[in-house]
Design a protein with these regions (language model features):
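A short, acidic, flexible beta-alpha connecting loop/helix-capping segment that sits on the rim
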Residues: 195-199
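Exposed loop/turn and edge beta-strand positions of beta-sandwich/beta-sheet ligand-binding modules
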Residues: 39, 174, 206
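Outer-membrane beta-barrel "beta-signal"
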Residues: 3, 180-189, 205-216
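Short amphipathic alpha-helical interaction segments
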Residues: 104, 108, 164, 168-172, ...
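C-terminal outer-membrane beta-barrel translocator/porin domains of Gram-negative envelope proteins
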Residues: 1-129, 133-162, 202, 210-215
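Glycine-centered small-residue hotspots that permit tight backbone geometry or close packing
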Residues: 84, 90, 159, 173-179, ...
């Protein structure tokens, strides 16, 4: 596959930014003549604002889209996954979106997620240890097992039939929460507690989550 990328970083600090913008775009294409002919397009946007003298407001948004071409299907192992730290906290990592007949997450070829966070330094600590509050939203769409009018899976030739989901912003999952972020000697650490706002019966919930690495 051919991959290309572009990024621009205007943040005032790479580890503890208080103002500025970060953008990243990425593409991946399975070239004609190869076994898999597909493409993936990704874009990430971050903006940081000094809300008050010691409070920073941060926005992160990500969008991704992939598909096959020349009659080839989009490879399932290139699917996007949403849920957990880095997308929608309060839900299990990678658990949102379509589920297979065995209830395992399938991911999808379309993703959208965004977060709004407010950071404030913890009193008595340096600026690398901060408390935060956040709002997350996101979802992933793709192929899902088809169901009949009774809600049963459609089976043909002994195998489930899959149909492409419609991209519906009404499917977005939302959560709010609090957490702590620390730029440790091992790298960025983040601990969060989230409350899902519009969980469905099939959603997998994980309120406490921990992450090492990546700022958002």
């Amino acid at each position: 596959a051919l991959t290309t990328g572009w990024s621009r970083d205007d943040r005032d600090n790479l580890l503890v930014p208080t103002r500025g913008r970060y953008q990243r775009a990425f593409s991946e294409v399975g070239l004609p003549g190869l076994d898999l002919q597909y493409y993936r397009l990704n874009y990430q946007f971050q903006q940081f604002f000094p809300l008050f003298p010691r409070v920073t407001l941060a926005f992160n948004g990500e969008i991704g889209y992939g598909d096959g071409y020349s009659g080839d299907p989009y490879p399932f192992f290139k699917n996007y996954y949403v849920g957990g730290i880095g997308s929608v906290r309060g839900f299990e990592t990678g658990s949102l979106g379509p589920r297979d007949v065995d209830d395992s997450p399938l991911g999808g070829n379309r993703r959208l997620n965004f977060s709004l966070e407010a950071y404030v330094p913890i009193p008595g600590a340096d600026r690398t240890l901060r408390a935060l509050t956040f709002v997350d939203a996101g979802q992933v769409w793709g192929l899902a097992p088809a169901r009949d009018e009774n809600g049963n899976f459609v089976i043909a030739n002994g195998r489930p039939v899959y149909e492409d989901q419609r991209t519906d912003l009404g499917d977005l999952r939302y959560s709010v929460g609090i957490g702590v972020a620390w730029i440790s000697p091992l790298g960025p650490l983040k601990l969060s507690y989230a409350y899902p706002l519009n969980r469905e019966s099939q959603d997998r919930i994980q309120r406490f989550q921990f992450q090492i690495g990546t700022g958002f």
